[in-house]
Amino acid sequence: MANVLDTLMERGYIKQFTHEAETRELLEKEKVTFYIGFDPTADSLHVGHFIAMMFMAHMQKAGHRPIALIGGGTATIGDPSGKTDMRKMMTNETIAHNVACIKKQMEKFIDFSDDKAILVNNADWLLNQNYVEFLREVGVHFSVNRMLSAECFKQRLERGLSFLEFNYMLMQGYDFYVLNKKYNCKMELGGDDQWSNMIAGVELVRKKSQKSAYAMTCTLLTNSEGQKMGKTVNGALWLDPEKTSPYEFYQYWRNVNDADVEKCLKLLTFIPMDEVRRLSSLEGSQINEAKKVLAFEVTKLVHGEEEATKAKQAAEALFGKGGDMSNVPTYEMGKDKLGSELLDILVEAEIVPSKAEGKRLVKQGGLSLNGEKVADFKKTLEEADFENGEVLIKRGKKNYNKIVLA
């Protein structure tokens, strides 16, 4: 049987290891318990988290046991990695709500039945921790000089790094120590932006428990130009259908750049590599077939086959190939809004994030109403604009929404 490490490397997941040869041997000989941490900074996971869950799912399919750690405790501080400013502090009530929402989402992707995976919250051991005891037990193993040289702190030192955030590395390292002690967890997986924090955890386990511990980082989801993927005009690409509709989600992947198709097929689907290579080798207009497969498969994993099929049908209907128009994202508007400015209605319907963005679209010729380009910022929406009680809004080349009179 192939080592899961070969699968992960072939599909492009692995960025860095702490101990590559030992990790390979461990994954061949044992069913390894490993963990990935997720901070509950919002009430939904987004596409950046999805790649981490795919990483976990490949490991679980190979017989290893994942621990999904929700950072209910560390979220009270906020991770400074990759941030230029201190994160806004959240209330305990907000964190608890976000944790509950994220738990529900995770269960779609990871099998938690019969102890095949474990869900834990570090609030259980961090929030009641005695601070002096923590410093004596954990702080003694950390060098401030070494911490200050870590990439996650370097970029913050000039702008100001609070002592609160400086503790984050100790707390994340302590998570690994607790999981190692309680569940014999031997490995931490995470995004490449977590490398410094992960090394700290590995070293803490090795020093304090005298046990072997390992870390592997996953590549971040970036496009061919090195920019993070998963951002839309309305913000992040969420996994919650209330925040990003299955249709919008499908359309995002249907419209990725040609150069990004192969990477996305590798990282975000379970399609066998032979088929990934075949799809990725398509050229010209044929690459659109690969994009349709990508969009359908990713949407199916996140929202289920039924929603993926509806999104596909909606896209086909809008591009003149038949299909069901009823699945296009729809906003119901009361008749009392007739005569209001179109841009105000689009902002209220969350079709555009702001009036300024709406004006930019109009200026660039990127906003259409029933196939006619909107040229006037102050265009009002009148009853005459509605055909059979609805209007079709098009943003850019391929984003559609319907407004119906309620």
UniProtKB/Swiss-Prot annotation:
It is an enzyme of class 6 (ligase). Residues 340-404 form the S4 RNA-binding domain. One of its GO terms (molecular function) is tyrosine-tRNA ligase activity. It is found in: Cytoplasm. The keyword Chaperone does not apply. PROSITE patterns: AA_TRNA_LIGASE_I, S4. The keyword DNA damage does not apply. One of its GO terms (biological process) is tyrosyl-tRNA aminoacylation. GO terms for cellular component: cytosol. A motif ('HIGH' region) lies at residues 40-49. CDD domains: S4 (cd00165), TyrRS_core (cd00805). Its EC number is 6.1.1.1. Its main location: cytoplasm. ATP binds at residue 231. Keywords: Aminoacyl-tRNA synthetase, ATP-binding, Cytoplasm, Ligase, Nucleotide-binding, Protein biosynthesis, RNA-binding. Catalyzes the attachment of tyrosine to tRNA(Tyr) in a two-step reaction: tyrosine is first activated by ATP to form Tyr-AMP and then transferred to the acceptor end of tRNA(Tyr). Belongs to the class-I aminoacyl-tRNA synthetase family. TyrS type 1 subfamily. Homodimer. NCBIfam families: tyrS. This is Tyrosine--tRNA ligase. It comes from Clostridium perfringens (strain SM101 / Type A). The gene is tyrS.
